[in-house]
Regions:
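A generic structural motif
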Residues: 22-26, 67-68, 122
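Glycine-rich anion/phosphate-binding loops
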Residues: 48-54, 101-109
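Short glycine-aspartate micro-motif
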Residues: 5-8, 69-73, 174
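Short beta-strand-loop/turn "lid" adjacent to the catalytic site in phosphate-handling enzymes
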Residues: 59, 64-105, 131-146
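Conserved active-site "lid/cap" helical segment
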Residues: 32-73
Length: 174
């Protein structure tokens, strides 16, 4: 039965995964990657197959099959600036992550998510990546005419906490 969501959060020294069934976590694991494990890879995106294999091993040991998934949600990467929201991972995004302007492990989320999703004909998404840019024009000012502030931070965390607080206060975040 397709009733699970796989969450992927690749970081510089680990890949965190969670599997949810409805709102309940049924598996949570942090796969550690030592410096020695990652040393053979010249570029972050070269780690894709290595991390993919680790994720598949964890899912197998947990008895979770890819064909039980309804979708995958992965940590978003260093794309061009975009508004906040949920985005389906597509070939254009994959190409941008394979040829990034900046390398970071978060770029692997979309790559791994799309690979796994394609294996079982489901969709993969990213949500509020670090490149979300919703700054107002005046917030870009730095005091130097030739220097503009660039928006880049952990939007997903900020918005998740803000939505929780808003719920507690009986308000909406948006």
């Amino acid at each position: 039965m397709k009733d699970k969501v796989l969450i992927l959060n690749p970081g510089s020294t680990s890949t965190k995964i969670a599997v949810y069934c409805n709102d309940e976590i049924i598996h949570l694991e942090s796969i550690q990657h030592s410096h020695e494990d990652l040393a053979p890879f010249a570029h972050v995106q070269d780690q894709k197959e290595y991390r993919l294999e680790k994720i598949l091993n964890v899912l197998d040991k947990a008895g979770i099959k890819l064909d039980e998934l309804i979708c995958i949600s992965a940590r978003g990467g260093l794309l061009h600036p975009i508004p906040g929201g949920t985005y389906e991972v597509n070939d254009i995004m994959v190409d941008e992550m394979m040829h990034p302007k900046k390398e970071h492990a978060c770029n692997l989320g979309a790559l791994i998510g799309k690979d796994l999703a394609d294996r079982v004909s489901i969709k993969s998404y990213i949500v509020d990546p670090v490149v979300v840019d919703e700054l107002w024009p005046w917030a870009r000012m730095t005091g130097l005419k030739e220097v503009k502030r660039v928006c880049q931070f952990h939007v997903l965390n900020q918005k998740a906490i803000a939505r929780k607080v808003a719920r507690v206060l009986g308000k909406t975040y948006e």
